[in-house]
Structure formats: structure tokens, C-alpha cells
Amino acid sequence: MEFSWGSGQESRRLLLLLLLLAAWEAGNGQLHYSVSEEAKHGTFVGRIAQDLGLELAELVPRLFRVASKGRGGLLEVNLQNGILFVNSRIDREELCRRSAECSIHLEVIVDRPLQVFHVDVEVRDINDNPPVFPATQKNLSIAESRPLDSRFPLEGASDADIGENALLTYRLSPNEYFSLEKPPDDELVKGLGLILRKSLDREEAPEIFLVLTATDGGKPELTGTVQLLITVLDANDNAPAFDRTIYKVRLLENVPNGTLVIKLNASDLDEGLNGDIVYSFSNDISPNVKSKFHIDPITGQIIVKGYIDFEESKSYEIIVEGIDKGQLPLSGHCRVIVEVEDNNDNVPDLEFKSLSLPIREDAPLGTVIALISVSDKDMGVNGLVTCSLTSHVPFKLVSTFKNYYSLVLDSALDRESVSAYELVVTARDGGSPSLWATASVSVEVADVNDNAPAFAQPEYTVFVKENNPPGCHIFTVSAWDADAQENALVSYSLVERRVGERALSSYVSVHAESGKVYALQPLDHEELELLQFQVTARDAGVPPLGSNVTLQVFVLDENDNAPALLAPRAGGTGGAVSELVPWSVGVGHVVAKVRAVDADSGYNAWLSYELQPGTGGARIPFRVGLYTGEISTTRALDETDAPRHRLLVLVKDHGEPALTATATVLVSLVESGQAPKASSRALVGAVGPDAALVDVNVYLIIAICAVSSLLVLTLLLYTALRCSALPTEGACAPGKPTLVCSSAVGSWSYSQQRRPRVCSGEGPPKTDLMAFSPSLPDSRDREDQLQTTEESFAKPRQPNPDWRYSASLRAGMHSSVHLEEAGILRAGPGGPDQQWPTVSSATPEPEAGEVSPPVGAGVNSNSWTFKYGPGNPKQSGPGELPDKFIIPGSPAIISIRQEPTNSQIDKSDFITFGKKEETKKKKKKKKGNKTQEKKEKGNSTTDNSDQ
């Protein structure tokens, strides 16, 4: 096809018109093509893919296909080039009969996303059908007496084509008797007739042969012929005549058999048999008409005898003959046109042309799910079909084309709420009463990974006993995902982190599918009390979603640590301790104190002490405190007692089963004058340089005790003056022992009552006021220590960097140990509230700090309180421990500083009360007096690291 373009304004107008037309066609989603009928296979129709705006490469992936109701196979599309072509023979007369318009309606459907395009292919008529007469020969009998201009009806020809191709012209072969009458303008009347132009004479021409030719208007012209054989008859001059030559009748479809259509009436001017008329159908009518109607030969009534269906035929033409009974019968003719009226007798036809299922729950609004075709064989209002959808569903019907509806998404979907919809589409016509049809479709909602796995609670607490076997199952986490299939497959994993210096995965693991949590190694309560970690649950969707849950695994203590004795010094052999006791001591004199710690917690760390019976069943004058570990005399010593005693002290915890440790104490009874000359802390079997050090220490201790005595006297005098000068401050109760302990960080006092100030009691200094140095330094450093004592009191010290918690001491902070001495213990564990002694400083300031009791003291750490120094000092961090701390029930301070193996024996580990010790007390008490005076003036400071 070639186009020639003009110039100027006309060209621009034409181009604009074509663009507007193309835009209108694209907006309606409809294309129009035309093709001639009887086109050969492969005939080009149109470039349908290009006209629809589709790329050739996407035709196959998007499942490009063509659908046509009842017209399948006539047209096809080449998916390689997108061309619509003729696939099989197209016969317009077969498709549309004699309809003026004939089109093939195609639906072009592509998926991903679903789109529907409507294509109309007009079938152009060609002149491929010649005119056809009902018969090839027609016989007519005409009396010679018929007058001129008599008319004899003929059945015209029919042409299956339309338009000019079906426009017929007739011509009669040349003759002198008859001429041809043109058919009337009424298109329903197809007949024509012969007009007698010259009188007939049987004797001259008994038979006349004529040829009637019908020619259509096509190019080239096609013709059809019929031979007319006219026989000339004698007699009977008048033929029957009907009232009208054409009758028109309206008849409803579906009327019952026997319904009267019309009653015809013909008359004959003759008399007798020549005037009797017999009615019949012409031989030229079709068998279909004869099967639908019947005529009574006497009355001329036409009645229904077959099923009348408007959808089958909208009208019927009946040719009726009236023939008289003369010897030479004459006939008259008329035409009856029966127009069938439509009745609403057909239900709508509903069909799903294409379904795009299932639909994703995140599909956008307006997504086309299905294409629905509706039709009704009735006409007019009876054939007007409307569709409706089930209410309260997130879908709607949209009319996209004549008799086509699209099922589209109207609101958001949520598969977790509704996973499938049962939709019912109802098609209803406009008749009265209306008829309807329904069709149902199940729409499944495809899952989208829009829900993360969820745990029942955000945190779980798990209790696991320590020393569990490796691979032990300790807990199971479970998460639920509201999605389906792969999106609901949950896998579990650890959120990796560091636990101390080790990775979390070295402690626990989680099974990816079951969620079972396993302990990979035995857990140790003393090393790790709480293991807190997170487990991630992640689904298998794309992209995957996940959530976390926190597990707090508390490691429960088991009695897996035996009590550990605190050795008097590092490198001591055998744990045996030698003590020198004067013969003159009385009842209750404390000989020594056995100290032990247990790395466990609770009852497993609650220690008790028992004195094992001696060999031979001999009674010994000693006992041990059940919970204090203090070895004291049970009576006054006499000469019947053995001079040497080997005491075995059994230290036992309260676990199940109980674990024990044994301490050996060697007690030697000496005269009072000999006691200072012997070492009260020598180990059994000590020889060599150790013995020489003991002799040197004796002289140093004597010197220190002398100085201490002066300090004690000064302190007593000062205290007496204070008590007499300030009577309102409260008197000191006689006999109430007060312990003042001085150390490098200040002075601490211990009493069973809280007092605003420290004052000495009445009675001997040994029982009223005792001052001790927490430890004796090496002889080479003792003079330096005496010189720096005052400086230590005046300025705070930094935390001692040369000590750390041991595992046993850390665990000891969780022990629950009760004291039995000095009215300290009131109830056992789990019983009523316990009254514990309070260690407080001499300062009266209310803002003094508080800390927990010292580790290893055998006292519940929740019951003791230290108060010392002004202000609110910093609390100790984990792993920090003061250099020295006080053991209740014993005038001593434990030092846990690690000393070299060759250092002086630690005098604070095991304590005796000989004269040598009394001398030391006096010296230390003087230092304590000075310290207390500084505290009362508010000038003392406390080291924060000793909390």
C-alpha cells in the first residue's frame, strides 16, 4: 500500500488525524482488520504484535495466545514475527449467513501480567455464490382462456452473498406471449411473476418453453437459470383469487402446536366443482417450513405443528395455492410472511475465558485475575446481560468490552487472614421475568514472605546444673511463622558474640531445624554463673525474615569443690601449723583459727568445723567453733595434760554429698616466760634460714610491743578524758570489747553495737580495747613501715595491683555461712532474720560508704556491712578484693596478698594470744589511737579499692 503526502497544512491535518485514530484504538485495547473470505492458508491479515505494542521477544514468555468463541482455528499468529494470518478456509456465508456485517471476534491474551486485547477481523464478501433457483425446471399449466395481463407467480432465485453480490436481476428468454414482472421492493418477498401479453391458443401452441435467468451484481457476474415449461389448457375460465396477494403475521416463539397462525380465504367465480377450492402449500417452499406449519385444505387455516424458535429463524415465508376442482383446474396464489417475535426463553451463557491463578497476596490493586464472556441468544432487552459478583470480597467485575467482563483485584489481600475465596459470578438478562446463570471459581491467594517468625515470648530463663555432660540438651526454642510453604520453614542459629575471651559457639549450639539448644562442654558455676545469648529464627522466604529471642542460662551450683584451707604462707608443707600456748591460759582462750574457703555457693559453701578425736581416746582440753573455726581451750590446763597435742580439724561443707578437708594444728604447752621466745607460727619441720628469721623477729617484736604499750597508755588516757569531758555522747559500757584495727588505708573498729564514737571500756586492755596490725612486714621493711604509717593515714592509696581474685575467693562471696560465737548466729539458713555484727568506722558522718563482708570469713555476704571513711567511695569492680579484711570473732585481719615463698611467715593467718602478742597489741593500739583521732576530725581518707 502506498501513500502520497501533500504539502502544507493538509499534510499536518491528515497526520494528526491518523495519530488521534491510533491513540483512540490503543486506548480501547481493540484492533480492526479485514480479510476476504475464501483466502488461502497463510494469507497476511495484520502485524498484530506490533499494533498491540508487544515486543516479539516477549510473545512466548508471556504465553501469547488467541481465543475465539466458536471460531477456533480460522486465524493464527506466528509467534516468531507477530503476524496474524489465515489458518483455514473462511466462508462468510457459513459464518454469518445473510447478515450484513460479518466479523470474527478474537481475544488476544498475554500473561505476566494478564492483559486482554480485543481484535475484530471483518470478513469481506466475495462473489463466490451464483444465484440459485429452487428447481432447475418449473411446470405451469395455463388455460387458453386466461385474460391478458394475467399474472402467474414464480419463485425467485437466491444468492448466498450479500450486498451487490446478492443484488439479482432477471431476464426472460425472448417470446411473444409472456413478459417478466420485477419483484416488489419488500425484501421479505423474493417472488416474481409472468404477465400474459398475448392470448394463448392451445391449438396453435400447446406448450411453450422459456428460460428465466438471474444475474447477481458481483464482478465478475454469476448467473443462474431455470427452465419454464408452460402447458396451455382448455375450459375453466376463472381461477381462484385470494383477498390479498401477501399476508403478514406476527407469532411468538415457543407457541404450542396447534396454534392458529392465519385463516386464508380465496374465491372462484365459477360454479360447481369449478368453484370449489382446495388449499395447499406450494411445492416451492422449503421442507423446514413444511415441518413447522400445516394448512387445512378445506378451511385454509394455517396452524403450528413444529417448534418455533426465534433464535433459529426470525421469519418464515409460506406460498399458498388455491386450486379449483374443475376438469382443467385453475389455481390462485398468495404469500404468507410469518414474523417470529422473541420471548425470553434463553438463560445467559457464562464462560471463564482465562484465569491467572493463584494470585499473590501482594498483587497491586487492579490486577486482572480472569476474563469472563457472557452471551444470550435472545434479542433486545431479553439479550441484555449484566454480571454481578459475590459481595464482601476484595474483587470486582469491570466491563471491558461488549459482553466481556474482567475480574480484577479491588482491595488488598492477606493470605494469613483468608487463604482462598469462593467467588460466584451471576449473569442476569433484562427480560421479564429475568433469567440468570451462575459460575463459580476458587481463587487461591499465593503466599508472600511478609511475616517474620515469632517466638511465644521475647525471653526465656533456663536453669542448668554445672558439670553437665558435653552435648547435653538444655532447652528447645520454637518460633511460628504465619506464612506457608518455604516462607514458613524456620531455621535457627546463634547470634555469635564473645563470652570473655571465647566465642559463644564454643559453649552452646542450636539445631537449625528443631531449635534444640545443646551445651557443647561442661559448664562451671564458679567460672560462669549466667550465660546470656540470642537465638535467631529465620524463614526460607525471599528475602528471608527473622527475629531473635534471648536465653538466660543460669548455671546452678553443684558441690564439686571441696573446702580449701588457707595456708599460713605460700609453700607451706602439709598444712600443719605449730602453736605455743602458755600453761596459764584459762577457759575459752583462743589458741588458733582454722580458715577455709569453698568455691561453691549457698549450702555447698557453708562450712562447719569438727575436731577429730585423738588417738587412744584421751580427752583433750580443746574445742573448735562449729562455724568459726576457732580452736579454744575448754578448761584450765594442768600438769596432767600432755605437753604436745596434735589436733585434726575436719572442715566440711553442707553439699550433697558433703566434701571435706583436714587441717593439722600442733599445740605445744610452754611456760609463760618461754612463750615469747618461741615462734607461734613456725611450720612443723621448718629448718635452715626459716629458723634464723624467727629469732630475728623475736627481738623486733619485743621492740614493737614496747612502743605499742606507750601508745595504748596514751590512747587510754585520751579516751578517759574524752568520756569525762563529753558525758552527753553516751558512756562506754564496761566489759564491751571494742576492736580497733589499723591498716595502711585507715582504722576500722568492730563492735556489736553501732556507736557514734569509739571509746575504750573499763577493765584490762586485753579485753576492753585491742589494736592489731594486719600483718608483720619483713624485718628489713619494718622501720620504713613505721615511718610511712602517718603518711598513709593522711592520703588515699590507689588499689593494690599485685593481687587478683582467685576462683575460690570469688565463689566464697556467694557462700552462706553462719557464726555460732558471741551471739552472732540466731537462725539457720532460710529461717528468721539474722542479726549480724556490724563493722563501722569511728567517723560519725552519715554518708559513710558500705561494702559487703570479706570473702572467706565464713559469714553470709548479704548480712555484713562495712562502714568506713567519710563520703561515698567507689564500689569495687568484679575481681577486686581489699588487701586485708576482718574475721569476726577473732581479733585478726586476713591478708590475701601473695607473699614470696621466702618471706616472713604471715602472722595474721593463725593467731595465738601469748605475751608476745600482747606486746604487739599495745604497740598497734597506739597507732590505732592516732588514726581514730584523725577520723574524728574528718581528715582521714579511705582507699576506694578496699571496698
Curated annotation (Swiss-Prot):
SMART domains, per the entry: CA
Region annotation (Required for interaction with FYN) ranges: 738-947
Ranges facing Extracellular side: 30-697
Pfam families noted in UniProt: Cadherin, Cadherin_2, Cadherin_tail
Keyword Disulfide bond (UniProt): yes
Record has Kinase as a keyword: no
Domain of life: Eukaryota
Gene Ontology biological process terms, A to Z: cell adhesion; homophilic cell adhesion via plasma membrane adhesion molecules; nervous system development
Biased composition (Basic and acidic residues): 906-920
Signal peptide: 1-29
Transmembrane regions: 698-718
Membrane topology of the entry: Single-pass type I membrane protein
Purpose of the protein: Calcium-dependent cell-adhesion protein involved in cells self-recognition and non-self discrimination. Thereby, it is involved in the establishment and maintenance of specific neuronal connections in the brain.
Protein name listed in UniProt: Protocadherin alpha-4
Native source species: Homo sapiens (Human)
Gene designation per UniProt: PCDHA4
